[in-house]
Amino acid sequence: MSLPTVLRQAPLVAALVLAGGQAHAAADSLNLFTEGEGLQALNLQELADASGYDTAQIDTWLRGGTYALRSGGTPRAWHYDAAAGILYFAAERHETEHTARNAHRLYRGVADAGPMWVVQGPGPATGSPGVFGERLVLEEDQVYAPWSSRDPEAHYWFWDYVYAGTSKDRLRLPLALPDPVAGGCGIQPRLRVHLQGSSDLSTDVDHQVLGILNPDGNGPSASVAFDAFAAQVLDIPFSSDALAASGNELELVSEPRPGVSRSLQRLDRIEVEYCRQMRAEDGQLWVRQAGPGVVTVAGLPGLEIAVIQDPGQPTAVWRKDLTVAPDGAEGYQVSFDAPATADYLIAHLGAAHTPATEVDDPSDLTSAANAADYLIIAPKAEMQAAAEALAAHRAADGLIVKIAWLQDVYDEFSLGRTSPLAIRTFLETALTWNRVPTYVVFLGRGTLNHKGRPDHFPGESLIPVRMASGPWGLFPSDNRYCDTNGDGIPEFACGRIPAETDVEALAYVEKLAAYESATIGDWMDLMIGVADDADPVSGDFPGDAAVSEALVSSLGYSVNARHFTGAGLTQFQDALKAAWNQGAALSAYWGHGGYDRWGAENFLPLADIAGLSNAPRLPIAAGLTCYAGNDSYPGFAALAAAMVVNPDGGAIATWMPTHQSLNAGAVTLGDHFLELLAGDKLTVGEAAAEAKARALVDDVPAWELDLFEVAGDPAVRLP
């Protein structure tokens, strides 16, 4: 089977294209990033610092209403307090597995929705705080468990778990429900508990979970049964008087099913609808579906109060027809007339949040006129110097190079919001370019904690991972970015340079340049073949290695075979490191593995990789094993990534799996990969793509194709 057409294009004239990288004196468009919901504020100096325009010019434009604001594809009205020099707007909550930030674009031009209408006048007589139907999402991401789902788009971070048949068969959780009140509010109060089945030990239904609201008070309860690795919602309706003023709890009980000794369920999140008093929390309150009539909100810390009718909409109204009075609890309350049922945002001005700002440089990634052989996707703030150095290096080889800054990808394909799907959609669009890229480089590490959860090593993940599904759950797969039609075969030669910093990435570019200009030596015709001892269940690893090594030998390479026999571990480790430090063009491994090792006995441990000093005599390393390419665990480096980012040695590129593989499929993939690399002299990215195409014909399952990915530059060749 021939390589996909887009991988066979020859370069045109060398060129370097920086997408969105041009210098500018001032910016007419800003990205504003918010977390949570509520009132946002930017003063003139903050806008000037972000945009490069002076405060007087921005003040003139704001007074003239010549700015527009959009979020989620919808125009949003804003309010400018000219006396204070502050721009206000309402932000809605946007939270996914990958981000807690919503994105807004503030730009000059034809206004889709300009400033809010302002309603002046006296307010109504003050009243008592009202009641409304609140909808809250309670969620804590405490632990990741991608093996618990089979849906690649599902959540894989969870709050907690219950486990029937163990001492952890019940769980009691506090419910943070501000100001609940008894009585009606026009809704049916209920809890929706989102659960994920995490075991499959029965041919019948595996799971049954009982939920009890306020179990010490004999509160309402409900149960649900479901199977295997399914997601399920436990629905618990209740009456308003079932909630206490504070201290509400939910108990979950994992109940044993007939014939099932143990069953595991994970808690994702809890959605709560209840009747809530109109009392601000932290100086703000978003009241949903209030009115008609007088609305009163208490609990505000001061007299400077904003009320926005229809917040976050193009028809939003800034209300000044208010009555403010003490609320009798050392705070203030505001009353206003609601002419119709609507949402209202009430906030003390001092409680407004300040959004993060970033210049929104123009980009044209959707244009069919684009042309590139080599496409770099990189986060500009973290990787600009390295991206431009890598681009210059490949442009010097005669390739047309384009950098697509990650935020530009989000701006054009996911409304500015962080989303792996935006990257996939962008690459689909790149297939329509005048010159379709052969190579795609993801410049930056990706982990399961791209959201930046504070207790799980935030800041490591620069480009989010995309998940694939296999027999043992979910696993990270850059192949699901580059395989745009879902057949398991990528349309591009893809690789990820798993650096966490610009400095680390620049060191890799220097390592790459030294490798590609290395002095000719015997190492360039050498392969190190490494094999685990045979496993009667998993595979004859030495036998598989011998067949593949014979193939590589027939292609003109000497083979230094290092096959572990189960004895003499220390000597084997020392000999392998010594051979590696002598240098080789190619290395391959057959056997058991983990994210941090080759061999169940750990004869090539992660801890040894930093000590390898074989640069520039660097191999392309293939790991026909399990997990060794999975660099997605927060706080832990993978063996493959460590080889690539070691500036003094290791490997120039690797091809290893991110999860558990089947030996037969791994061997088939490996044989094709080695033949294409050493025989056809393809680049590592091209060899990886074509190996998957050939393996699919050989009946290797598509999920196993998603496992293997390139760490390093996909345009690397054997010397």
Language-model features: locations:
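Cysteine-dependent hydrolase recognition
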Residues: 25-719
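Bacterial N-terminal signal peptides that target proteins for export
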Residues: 1-11
